[in-house]
């Protein structure tokens, strides 16, 4: 029962998004999708303001190649005083593929996007499926997978460039060690054997850190019948008296 729900890889066109199902539960919904591939959505009990779609939400058209606007992978909105940026980063396939080069260029555009957004000095939350394990601690078998796809030096350096020591991995505020995964391959009984990666991430701006109360991976959801191969990541933020217009069952807490 989150206050804000962010989805990635919705795989439906805008016309086919199950809008009514969420509206019947009291949510406002914004999304950007395409048939069979990609797609992102922000679903909120709180009012969604200043909704932006694609890289053109922050960047001028002459900066972004049209090739990087076709895939629906990024949206943002201003909700309850926080800028929510929801991303579905390309997987990259393999290090010698064109998809890998596409991924690195996409991350370069994301860096420019975040730099532009930061000019407004908003409380900010960047989240989604990053398809990058930030460190060796985020892979069940780093000796096997380090320097491969989702764990290569260029990918990690691109992620660091985006964050620039100005954003904090919310989960790592509470859990420092290894053994915490958000994604398990459908193949080879990966979930049953707990062979996972932590590639679904929530980053918060430093000015939002005092409001962060918890961050968990709901990995039990992966055990459901016909589950996603990803588990939900949840954070709770507390704004005390700051946003008195928001009235919820949890007082001043809201969950993403």
Regions found by a protein language model. Give the residues of each.
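Surface polyanion/phosphate-binding segment centered on an Asp-His-Pro turn
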Residues: 216-256
């Amino acid at each position: 029962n989150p206050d804000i729900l962010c989805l990635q890889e919705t795989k439906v066109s805008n016309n086919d998004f199950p809008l009514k199902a969420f509206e019947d539960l009291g949510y406002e919904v914004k999304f950007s999708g395409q048939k069979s591939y990609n797609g992102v959505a922000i679903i909120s009990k709180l009012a969604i303001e200043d909704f932006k779609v694609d890289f053109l939400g922050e960047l001028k058209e002459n900066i972004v190649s049209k090739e990087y606007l076709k895939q629906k992978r990024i949206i943002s909105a201003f909700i309850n005083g926080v800028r929510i940026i929801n991303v579905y980063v390309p997987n990259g396939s393999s290090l010698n593929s064109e998809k890998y080069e596409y991924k690195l260029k996409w991350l370069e555009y994301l860096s420019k996007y975040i730099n532009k957004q930061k000019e407004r000095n908003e409380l900010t939350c960047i989240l989604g499926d990053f398809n990058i394990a930030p460190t060796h601690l985020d892979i069940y078998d780093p000796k096997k997978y380090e320097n491969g796809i989702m764990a290569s030096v260029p990918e990690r350096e691109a992620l660091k460039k985006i964050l620039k020591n100005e954003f904090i991995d919310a989960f790592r505020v509470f859990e420092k060690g290894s053994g915490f995964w958000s994604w398990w391959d459908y193949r080879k009984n990966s979930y049953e054997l707990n062979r996972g990666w932590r590639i679904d991430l929530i980053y918060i701006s430093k000015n939002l850190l005092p409001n962060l109360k918890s961050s968990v991976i709901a990995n039990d959801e992966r055990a459901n019948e016909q589950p996603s191969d990803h588990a939900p990541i949840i954070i709770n933020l507390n704004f005390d008296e700051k946003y008195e217009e928001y009235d919820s069952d949890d007082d001043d807490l809201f969950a993403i």
